[in-house]
């Protein structure tokens, strides 16, 4: 593949569930911040030549990172919601007919072979593609009971259920238009693919590794550190 690709990384969130003294993307594991590892993994794909990072306007951490001086990095002001930050990143891309990958700032363990398969699948598709992992556990649908505890309503058939991962890859204009339309109509948009789904597109599912975890809870840090150490040995 000779086409150059851009990635957008929304990194304006505060990560309150981590209960840390700083946003989770700036926590250190395996010698670097999570954000630095995430960007390193994206640049492991030779076609990804630019990464746009959307950060909070009051972010006091990014400027001290080596990333701040990397010519391949573009920084834009993020917004209150993920979609706002993604929009800001998309606005910095001049060619709306090109492809863009959107990747979570706190997902530092994505592997090169997953990136390669995602890019190949997206370019073959009219509706883009996402990395995803099949659901393996038994899934329960719950409801809140009078005592405040959660009760089981039913067991959900896990056939054809997938965990949506990132990166997610789409044409820039297609993603922009889908996000705008879905949000204007009040649709619940939890990831980029959900905006395209709302607009009638069928993005492709590309089976990815389950160790491409998103650091969300404190216990995720040790696991992400272990996975990164394995990556560094390869």
From Swiss-Prot:
Q: E.C. number, please?
A: 2.7.7.60
A GO MF label: 2-C-methyl-D-erythritol 4-phosphate cytidylyltransferase activity
- Pathway involvement of the protein, from the record: Isoprenoid biosynthesis; isopentenyl diphosphate biosynthesis via DXP pathway; isopentenyl diphosphate from 1-deoxy-D-xylulose 5-phosphate: step 2/6
* Marked site: Positions MEP for the nucleophilic attack: 158, 214
> A single Pfam family, by name?
IspD
Q: What are the disulfide bonds?
A: none
Point out the annotated site residues (description: Transition state stabilizer). 17, 24
Gene3D superfamilies assigned to the protein according to its UniProt record, in alphabetical order: Spore Coat Polysaccharide Biosynthesis Protein SpsA, Chain A
Keywords for this entry? Isoprene biosynthesis, Nucleotidyltransferase, Transferase
Q: Write down the superkingdom of origin.
A: Bacteria
Query: GO BP, one example?
Result: isopentenyl diphosphate biosynthetic process, methylerythritol 4-phosphate pathway
Q: Which family does it belong to?
A: Belongs to the IspD/TarI cytidylyltransferase family. IspD subfamily.
HAMAP family named among the record's database cross-references: IspD
Q: What is this protein called?
A: 2-C-methyl-D-erythritol 4-phosphate cytidylyltransferase
């Amino acid at each position: 593949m000779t086409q150059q690709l851009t990635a957008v990384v929304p990194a304006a969130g505060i990560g309150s569930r981590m209960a840390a003294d700083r946003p989770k993307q700036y926590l250190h594991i395996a010698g670097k911040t999570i954000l630095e590892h995430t960007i390193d993994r994206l640049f492991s794909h030779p076609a990804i030549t630019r990464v746009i990072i959307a950060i909070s306007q009051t972010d006091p951490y990014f400027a001290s990172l080596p990333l701040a001086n990397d010519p391949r990095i573009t920084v834009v002001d993020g917004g209150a919601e993920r979609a706002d930050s993604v929009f800001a990143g998309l606005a910095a891309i001049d060619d709306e007919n090109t492809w863009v990958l959107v990747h979570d700032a706190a997902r530092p363990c994505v592997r090169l072979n997953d990136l390669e398969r995602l890019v190949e699948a997206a370019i073959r598709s009219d509706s883009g593609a996402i990395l995803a992992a099949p659901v393996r556990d038994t899934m329960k649908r719950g409801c809140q009971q009078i005592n405040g505890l959660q009760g089981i309503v039913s067991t959900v058939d896990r056939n054809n259920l997938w965990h949506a991962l990132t990166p997610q890859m789409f044409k820039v204009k297609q993603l922009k238009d889908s996000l705008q339309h879905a949000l204007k109509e009040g649709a619940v948009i939890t990831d980029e693919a959900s905006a395209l789904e709302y607009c009638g597109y069928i993005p492709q599912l590309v089976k990815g590794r389950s160790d491409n975890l998103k650091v969300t809870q404190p216990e995720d840090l040790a696991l992400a550190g272990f996975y990164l150490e394995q990556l560094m040995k390869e």
